[in-house]
A protein has these predicted regions:
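Class I (Rossmann-like) S-adenosyl-L-methionine-dependent methyltransferase catalytic domain
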Residues: 2-115, 120-127, 149, 169-224
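Local beta-strand N-terminus motif with an aromatic residue
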Residues: 71, 132-133
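A conserved beta-strand element that flanks and buttresses the S-adenosyl-L-methionine
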Residues: 137
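Short catalytic micro-motifs in class I SAM-dependent methyltransferases
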Residues: 140-144
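A short glycine-rich, Lys/Arg-flanked "PGG" loop and its adjoining helix->strand segment in the class I
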Residues: 152-164
Length: 225
């Protein structure tokens, strides 16, 4: 188990019990150095080209839905400093970034992205925080942080935040490749593709698939309303 501790328990417990203040404080502490870390190819955040691969796949998915995306908005769930939203915003009518960390949101707002808003909030409340969107994106293995029970709640929230024919793309840690990568934290939840697809169906998505080769540390879920 990771050495990360809190006065209210281990890191895994903090997420599983949805201790949102403790989670926010954890990410607040990383906000000022987050983009610098992502710019370092040796950083664990870039293990297996996670960020670059996510954005490339999302751009291809958007290109196949160009007209649909152009008349709808996009929600970045767990947006951090707004890097993903900055990559895709031009393809959508509007964008919203939601993150639990006030300091992350402060950095995101400083980008002054046109037609975008950044709000402090948690991803369990997407339908009440945002207008319904054509796409919900989430990069940062959000479900692997929160675990199965809370992850299911996030999927339900994402489904409720979408317009008909809208789509969700999020990444998750791949159980099948867990032993093949140097950075394999024990305090995260690793999912099989079959499991994550079943969770998406329970959340009400009509079409679900996973994207990525079986040896990838993180796979992507594509779920369509």
């Amino acid at each position: 188990m990771s050495g990360d501790q809190s006065g209210i328990g281990t890191l895994r417990e903090i997420y599983a019990r949805r201790h949102l203040k403790a989670i926010a404080a954890r990410w607040d502490a990383r906000a000022d150095t987050w983009e610098h870390a992502l710019a370092d190819p040796a950083c664990h955040l870039n293990d297996d080209d996670a960020f670059g691969r996510f954005t490339r796949v999302v751009r291809r998915l958007i290109a196949r839905r160009r007209r649909f995306c152009s008349i709808h908005g996009v929600i970045d769930a767990g947006c951090g400093t707004g890097l993903v939203l900055a990559e895709v915003l031009s393809a959508f009518a509007w964008g919203m970034g939601i993150d639990i960390s006030p300091r992350m949101i402060r950095v995101a707002r400083a980008k002054r992205l046109a037609h975008a808003r950044f709000l402090v909030g948690d991803c369990f409340n997407l339908p009440s925080l945002c207008p319904r969107a054509g796409a919900v994106l989430s990069r940062g293995v959000l479900l692997s942080h929160y675990g199965r029970e809370q992850g299911q709640a996030i999927l339900h929230a994402a489904r409720a935040a979408l317009v008909p024919r809208g789509f969700l793309v999020l990444d998750f840690l791949n159980e099948a490749a867990r032993a093949k990568h140097r950075h394999a934290p024990e305090n995260k939840t690793w999912f099989t593709g079959r499991e994550i697809k079943a969770m998406a169906r329970r959340a009400g998505f009509s079409t679900v698939t996973t994207l990525g080769k079986p040896n990838r540390r993180a796979l992507l879920l594509l779920a369509e309303a």
